[in-house]
Amino acid sequence: MSNSEPSTSTPSGKTKKRGKKCETSMGKSKKSKNLPRFVKIQPIFSSEKIKETVCEQGIEECKRMLKGHFNAIKDDYDIRVKDELDTDIKDWLKDASSSVNEYRRRLQENLGEGRTIAKFSFKNCEKYEENDYKVSDSTVTWIKPDRTEEGDLMKKFRAPCSRIEVGDISPPMIYWVPIEQSVATPDQLRLTHMPYFGDGIDDGNIYEHLIDMFPDGIHGFSDNWSYVNDWILYKLCRAALKDYQGSPDVFYYTLYRLWPNKSSQREFSSAFPVLCENFAEKGFDPSSLEPWKKTKIAEGAQNLRNPTCYACLAYTCAIHGFKAEIPIEFPNGEFYNAMLPLPNNPENDGKMCSGNCWKSVTMKEVSEVLVPDSEEILQKEVKIYFMKSRIAKMPIEDGALIVNIYVFNTYIPFCEFVKKYVDEDDEESKIRSCRDAYHLMMSMAENVSARRLKMGQPSNRLSIKDRVNNFRRNQLSQEKAKRKLRHDSLRIQALRDGLDAEKLIREDDMRDSQRNSEKVRMTAVTPITACRHAGPCNATAENCACRENGVCSYMCKCDINCSQRFPGCNCAAGQCYTKACQCYRANWECNPMTCNMCKCDAIDSNIIKCRNFGMTRMIQKRTYCGPSKIAGNGLFLLEPAEKDEFITEYTGERISDDEAERRGAIYDRYQCSYIFNIETGGAIDSYKIGNLARFANHDSKNPTCYARTMVVAGEHRIGFYAKRRLEISEELTFDYSYSGEHQIAFRMVQTKERSEKPSRPKSQKLSKPMTSE
């Protein structure tokens, strides 16, 4: 076992411009000798960046410590493995004292040593006559195992064969997985392998281009110091962390420097708790050796109130990405209300359910905790209130689940409720009898005022007309405020450069006539996220997630009559396909939570339904993939489509802007990209997973459809719409908005009849219909 470590080196050059071809040479792929083998240390647990001199000194000290522990652990591992191997393969070793290929030995005996063995031999194969489409008979002879298991000699087999026409060969395509809806994908900070770009490509040159884009490094460009597996890593971390007093980032980074092909620094930082689950003894707490990890998984789970998706209401949704948010305010107020029966009720006379029945509680005990009025005493039941936040923080063994269930089951007699939902044999629970459950309800009851009860309660919903007017006034006031800031900036610029300020302001107003009109213009500049804050929503609310967009959605927890909330439309059924519909004009699909008249929630196929609801319902035109006259494969219609009618959605992996840059750097070298950028941030990549829309080709002169970004259930999705009336079997094309460089690359692909399309420019953004206007 060697104690040497791969030599380190710093990057020899900066990242080159994307899209430029790397230098090539004849022969196999080669690696550069002077490579930046390791990425820089990342401040994961440290608040400040560690100085380079201090970091290198700490790394060297940590290396010596880890290597000292490693030698003893590796020796112990070798002894354990040797004993297991001797036990497990002892019988096999007896029967396999020498390695013999019986099949090869018999062939050598029959054919002679050193003779070439022909796998196939063709006989009686006549030439194929192109004018005569009859195919002559042929036979194929091949060698099978020449002896049976019993040792009997087998005969050679001859099988008849014939030649057939190959026919048209479809263009090849990259393997992909079909999906119906885009899936949120986390960033890949570590490149798992270096892609193959062809023979003669210098991997070292490509490495220099990509290393700065992957903060966790590229696997395979540095050698491990020695062999390591999960068991050895667990033993090593447990031994080293006991006495380690340095920076945790230096510790995990040193592990990465010693074993760069095992994991990255970020992966090492979260590996120890997982290793403890597999190898540690029962009851061992990993946080005792990693005190810098303050947030525990269990504590996070206790604070999680609602793990449902904010968009589709699915439990821990994988499509939109699970985002656990803790709202400041509870919907429908901060309190639950329930009716609790009072003792000495004539209707409850009779036998008690047990010796610990709630009926044994006296009215004096109740009066010390609750304050029922005279009417409640006559009715023999009192109205109590439970604070939602208190129940959310309450452990289950203290009765949190019982209180939650009782709120929705007050119609059941209390004794029957306890018999149904309280486990008397549960030793861990503190609530094990009817009397315990009654005392629990009394102890959880809150004495609140009428004013406090109204806090958080939803207001009565205004009419659609009032909500539209409020929203309109709010948007116009925001537009005026933005216009004033813009004009003030132009005046400062004119004063600095000696220009005419009024002229600059007039030119600015003329560039967009909508700024001077009374029409509301909605533009989303960030992804739509439901706001969770106290107080009204406006441009000055710092904690409002809707502040930059200036629009709240139906998912927000603000008041239902919030002037910033998008009110939806009031169109008749089937009319939401023109700019007269404010949902269609704002690039929002209709939603049953806001639109009441357009029948977007209808499920009956016999009635007229909303026409601005295609992506939500996933109602798409039937399409198929086939050879295209433009380039490779293309997308074709199986049914006609009217002008501006929704055809299909562009689905794939929903990735961030940084991840799109990383993938784009690799795709550009293939001259093939399926990344579709969204103006509000992120992109859709259908390279590996997607739908048939990935085959839509580029046509800048006569496109048959256009792409449009729509807000659907709070997220931006890309749809293709017909630019004119389209017939069956017409190819679906749209303008990729190529730059001059990409136009040249596209013409080269057309000449070579490539099966895949060249990369779309990274600068392409979609926010509105891409029309010729």
Swiss-Prot record:
State what protein this is by name. Histone-lysine N-methyltransferase mes-2
Instruction: Give positions of region: Disordered.
Output: 1-33, 749-773
Q: What positions does the domain CXC occupy? A: 505-614
- Domain of life of the organism encoding this protein: Eukaryota
Instruction: Spell out the subunit comment.
Output: Interacts directly with mes-6 via its N-terminal domain. Forms a heterotrimeric complex with mes-3 and mes-6. Does not interact with mes-4.
Please list the residue ranges annotated as the SET domain.
616-737
In what ranges is there compositional bias, type Basic and acidic residues? 750-759
Note the Pfam families from the entry.
preSET_CXC, SET
Annotated organism of origin: Caenorhabditis elegans
Query: Where is it made, tissue-wise?
Result: In adults, it is predominantly expressed in the germline, and weakly expressed in intestinal cells. Expressed in the hypoderm.
Q: Which gene encodes it?
A: mes-2
One annotated GO molecular function: chromatin binding
**Subcellular localization(s) per the UniProt record:** Nucleus
Positions of region (Interaction with mes-6): 1-194
**Which lineage ranks, top first, belong to the organism behind this chain?**
Eukaryota, Metazoa, Ecdysozoa, Nematoda, Chromadorea
Could you list this entry's UniProt keywords, alphabetically sorted: Developmental protein, Methyltransferase, Nucleus, Repressor, S-adenosyl-L-methionine, Transcription, Transcription regulation, Transferase
Q: Name one GO biological process term.
A: methylation
Give the Enzyme Commission number: 2.1.1.356
